[in-house]
């Protein structure tokens, strides 16, 4: 009898498992961040592809390409700050802005470094 009762309780406990947590706002913000990050990278790639690489150093061309994509960078920075405030509601606006600046700074540095490598490869192919 006790065994049957224990089996019944265990089977009922399995039926009442908590549903997976649904976080539509967080998922939406993550998708928006991913799209803006991708758009930022595509913008820099397009600027590099269209750039005249015959005269200027690769670093200068890369810096100009990143600067030309500043509107997307700014939108990404705002979205990162919004995401930080969503995930860390106790953060002050200054903390969220600092997180956004640091996060977007890392992305910008990587895009610039990759752009330099791409430009140098193209310049070497021209020789």
Language model features by range: what are they?
Residues 12-14:
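C-terminal motif of bacterial Sec signal peptides marking the signal peptidase cleavage site
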Residues 33-36, 50-55, 60-62, 76-80:
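Extracellular/mature segments of secreted proteins
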Residues 63-127:
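Compact alpha-helical subdomains of small soluble proteins
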Residues 16-19:
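Bacterial signal peptide processing site
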Residues 23-45:
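Post-signal peptide N-terminal segment of mature Sec-exported envelope proteins
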Residues 1-8:
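Sec-dependent signal peptide recognition
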């Amino acid at each position: 009898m006790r065994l049957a009762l224990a089996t019944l309780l265990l089977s009922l406990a399995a039926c009442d498992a908590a549903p997976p947590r649904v976080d539509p706002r967080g998922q939406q913000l993550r998708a928006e961040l991913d799209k803006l990050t991708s758009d930022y990278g595509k913008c820099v790639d397009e600027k590099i592809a269209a750039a005249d690489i015959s005269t200027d150093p690769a670093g200068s061309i890369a810096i100009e390409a990143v600067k030309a994509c500043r509107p997307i960078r700014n939108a990404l920075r705002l979205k990162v700050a919004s995401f930080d405030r969503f995930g860390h509601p106790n953060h002050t606006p200054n903390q969220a802005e600092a997180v956004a600046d640091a996060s977007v700074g890392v992305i910008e540095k990587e895009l610039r470094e990759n752009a330099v490598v791409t430009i140098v490869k193209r310049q070497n192919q021209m020789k």
